[in-house]
Regions:
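Hydrophobic structural segments
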Residues: 1-119
């Protein structure tokens, strides 16, 4: 890392990033729920998010209750990859808001630790 002192090399986790794939039609409602739970704050800014369009594909198997399509039918659907940040202490609230607002039976999402230098 090229650190000159031990203090300069220490990092801590104070925020995390949520990445989730959301159907185009649900982007606004999922964002609103996440922001209401405390996600999207960066410094003096609120409601911060980044999203990019893509295409999701899935095949609902027996026992599934798909929101879109039917069991045994492969589907392709326009989705957004949505990213936002949140303080670590709000993780339970943010994940709960995601699961309650996302239309999919089993939403795909990742949680990443964001390292920040201790100063």
């Amino acid at each position: 890392m090229g650190c000159t002192s031990e203090r300069a090399c220490k990092v801590r986790v104070v925020r995390r990033k949520l990445v989730v794939f959301v159907p185009v039609s649900a982007l606004e409602s999922v964002c609103e729920a996440l922001f209401a739970a405390g996600a999207g704050h960066i410094g003096g800014y609120e409601r911060c998010a980044w999203y990019t369009p893509g295409m999701g594909t899935f095949l609902a198997g027996e026992g599934a209750a798909p929101t879109i399509g039917e069991v045994g039918q492969e589907r392709r659907i326009g989705e957004y990859r949505l990213e936002t940040v949140y303080p670590t202490e709000l993780e339970a609230d943010v994940v709960r808001a995601l699961l309650e607002s996302h239309p999919y039976e089993e939403p795909v999402f990742d949680l990443y630790e964001l390292l920040e230098p201790e100063v």
